[in-house]
């Protein structure tokens, strides 16, 4: 029996009387997707080995042999020559088997005081911390690109919409700054999530800790963690840090999706506000005239995919008792795909934004439609003593009359406005200066406060956002 069991590949096989079926091996193996954690697995193992040697749990010679073997394994992985084996289940046992083949008993001693449960939790946190740093950098690049475009359009007037109906005129730079604000909060969320990712689970072992005299704080310091997970059961079993990351990622993609929707609308010939550079568009196999905004369209679609991963991870965790369960193997593919999707999307959008051509004349022409300055006329009357609700009603009468006359408010004479607004003996509240508030420039200039669309405020907001970006 001993000789038969010795032939089994699994590190845990001595407990069993028959080998695992090939179907189960394929069903339970994770090596073909968790191998992307390999370099972080090595990083964690080196810190663990250093701690074991420091604490006298293994000999210094064993630590040196482990370090030498891991250096060779790293080279093989980076060169693409490392042989990944399905029989060895996952990234951890593949690396351990290769290490043992090179370092002998020293390799077998590496797993002392450790379980794959706390090992994989450590690997994921190391990997995710690195990816968060990358995503934060990409968010900053996108914010910078939007600020550059906004700075070019602090006086370009575009209609602002509610319910996709023309509402009030704004400057295009102000519109773009709304997305800068969104992506700034996304950056803050990522950095906040990083704090909870940046805790060391290693040392929790399978679930209850270990009887060896380990030094978890030393390992945390070696790996750059801010501290250790304070409860061994929690350390190996929960993936809330990954779920929190995916929630923040879903919000990033939601903001990208909203921006994408507007890009698609703006590029439509029916709107014609912008053009997107050819390198970000595709054509049609049948319609030779087509230039399709595939990148923003696909970003909208990929947002649903990322949202689905978030729901999948929440569902994965909701029914698990403490501590670790095999269910958690299913955390990696949605997490990996979320990171890949967000990274690719942010990278391409940061490159695409500078190539947007703004058609300012079309924006202005659209802003002159739909009575965009109606609120300005109401405010004009309020400032002359009319209660706002009465002013609102008076301007509504004027808008209805313009519908019948097929003209804009600015096309009406002072006499027509006095007659149409139905103000009776208060008609003289409409003075000869009324048309100054009915111009697009007058409208945007009047919103001269923090957060408003006045060009000077937009310039100040851009400066503020650039300072925040530099922090």
Curated annotation (Swiss-Prot):
It comes from the Bacteria. Pathway: Amino-acid biosynthesis; L-arginine biosynthesis; L-arginine from L-ornithine and carbamoyl phosphate: step 3/3. GO terms for biological process: arginine biosynthetic process via ornithine; L-arginine biosynthetic process. Disulfide bonds: none annotated. SUPFAM superfamilies: L-aspartase-like. One of its GO terms (cellular component) is cytosol. It is an enzyme of class 4 (lyase). It is found in: Cytoplasm. This is Argininosuccinate lyase. The gene is argH.
């Amino acid at each position: 029996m001993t000789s038969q069991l010795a032939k089994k590949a699994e590190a845990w096989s001595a407990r069993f009387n028959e080998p695992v079926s090939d179907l189960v091996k394929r069903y339970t193996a994770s090596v073909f997707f968790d191998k992307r954690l390999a370099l972080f697995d090595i990083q964690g193992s080196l810190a663990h080995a250093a701690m074991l040697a420091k604490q006298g749990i293994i000999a210094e010679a064993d630590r040196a042999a482990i370090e030498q073997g891991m250096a060779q394994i790293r080279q093989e992985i980076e060169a693409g020559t490392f042989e990944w084996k399905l029989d060895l289940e996952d990234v951890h046992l593949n690396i351990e088997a290769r290490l043992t083949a090179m370092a002998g008993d020293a390799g077998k001693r590496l797993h002392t005081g450790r379980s794959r449960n706390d090992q994989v939790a450590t690997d994921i946190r190391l990997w995710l911390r690195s990816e968060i740093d990358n995503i934060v950098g990409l968010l900053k690049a996108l914010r910078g690109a939007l600020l550059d475009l906004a700075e070019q359009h602090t006086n370009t007037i575009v209609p602002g919409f509610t319910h996709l109906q023309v509402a009030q005129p704004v400057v295009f730079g102000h519109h773009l700054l709304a997305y800068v604000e969104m992506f700034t909060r996304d950056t803050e969320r990522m950095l906040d999530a990083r704090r909870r990712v940046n805790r060391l689970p290693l040392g929790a072992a399978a679930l209850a800790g270990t009887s060896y005299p380990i030094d978890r704080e030393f390992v945390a310091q070696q790996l750059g963690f801010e501290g250790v997970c304070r409860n061994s059961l929690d350390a190996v079993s929960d993936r809330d840090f990954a779920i929190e990351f995916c929630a923040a990622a879903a919000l990033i993609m939601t903001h990208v999706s909203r921006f994408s929707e507007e890009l698609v609308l703006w590029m439509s010939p029916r709107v014609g506000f912008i053009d997107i550079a050819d390198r970000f568009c595709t054509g049609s196999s049948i319609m030779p005239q087509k230039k399709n905004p595939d990148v923003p369209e696909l970003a909208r679609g990929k947002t649903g995919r990322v949202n689905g991963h978030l729901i999948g991870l929440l569902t994965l965790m909701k029914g698990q008792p403490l501590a670790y369960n095999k269910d958690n193997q299913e955390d990696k593919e949605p997490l990996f795909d979320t990171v890949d999707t967000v990274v690719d999307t942010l990278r391409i959008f940061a490159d695409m934004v500078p190539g947007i051509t703004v058609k300012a004349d079309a924006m202005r022409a659209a802003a002159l439609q739909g009575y965009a300055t109606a609120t300005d006329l109401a405010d004009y009357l309020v400032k002359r003593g009319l209660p706002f609700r009465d002013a609102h009603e008076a301007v509504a009468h004027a808008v209805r009359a313009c519908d019948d006359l097929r003209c804009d408010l600015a096309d009406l004479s002072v006499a027509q406005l006095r007659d149409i607004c139905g103000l009776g003996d208060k008609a003289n509240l409409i003075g000869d200066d009324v048309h100054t508030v009915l111009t697009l420039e007058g409208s945007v200039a009047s919103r001269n406060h923090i957060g408003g669309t006045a060009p000077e405020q937009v310039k100040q907001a851009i400066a503020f956002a650039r300072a925040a970006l530099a922090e």
